[in-house]
């Protein structure tokens, strides 16, 4: 799952992005924009990197340094002699600008139905060096010692088109296989975030160990399409995994009886959802999988406060605010009823507080509601309501295949210590003793060995995915999947 704020948009759990696909321009025209450009919107600096790719097309990425977001791929770039148009999927936004001269673009940034001015200025080589792409030594690069095929396929009624990469060994087969399932938000097949590509790292490692790996673009990322309206929930994304599962079973190089699922965060919610109704899923690996959507959201609010030394009173106050918000997200039918319910509960809570607390840090009802107002439309999405109601036990009680559940000890987005115990006990109570759980010391939500272990640190770390966690996964698969 994702958790990174971009301008007015929140993405639950582990912030991720879409795979870059660029539109065609000639090398000569594309080179007009090549370089690093900078602009500011709502006090937030944005950095655009444009380059002419091997095919002569302009490609781009965007950074938001203040938010710790780097390497956000631009889905399409269309360049003419005097203009540029960019489309992004995370955030869902666009940028259109006129080229005033070699160093200035005058344009508009559009996001969430709003448009605002955003002018970009080309940075000098010295300035651009400050925003150079971060070092990511684990990201695999060709040539690979295995097959790596770009594939595309549709769901049964052709309403969803999925783009993916299938990797598999050059010799032998048919191979045991696994589908990688991303966390929440719009993510590409590599689960790209902060310049890291953890799914590319996992796929490379497992393929070298003799497995086939399918990693898939989310809807509206990379080559994938499909409905992403306010009515779409995790259940719809589970159906996309079912589509991938059916496609993979039909491939001649794949052992159809040995296909499993590896899910990260929200993807680890989806894995048991699919396995509960598809008894031919051979195994599950859960990476930071939540036991309860509601409790995970509360944990995400409180754990950072504890980490930064907030007082007990302030933490208790924050918990009440969070619970008021969550209660009304479930009961409200629209933004107006949500705000009305929040106002009523919050005022009742304040009336019972001592004056000392109200004076120190408690927000007035007006300020509290003002802080929620920009988010209300997003909080009314069906996706959030499904998340709040999600309970892993509803699915794990029906899972009969082997399960490996891993969590990082330093994760501040999912309470792994308690959730791993819950997953273990739930499976065993349901008669499935083929479960292994492990809380890996020193790892964060992205399975990086961390120092400060904050969300802001994700992009500062060079490690994309812990070699220790990779080895645990590979060894477990060798024992439980290969035969």
Locate the predicted segments by residue.
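Conserved alpha/beta-hydrolase "acid-adjacent" motif
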Residues: 412-420
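N-terminal cap/lid segment of alpha/beta-hydrolase-fold proteins
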Residues: 129-173
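Short beta-strand element of the alpha/beta-hydrolase
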Residues: 174-184
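Alpha/beta-hydrolase active-site loop
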Residues: 231-252
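Short beta-strand/loop motif that positions the catalytic acidic residue
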Residues: 399, 405-407
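Central antiparallel beta-sheet cores of small beta-barrel/beta-sandwich binding domains
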Residues: 24-100, 106-111, 145
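Short amphipathic alpha-helix adjacent to the substrate-entry channel of hydrolases
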Residues: 192-213
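Accessory cap/linker subdomain of secreted extracellular hydrolases
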Residues: 287-397
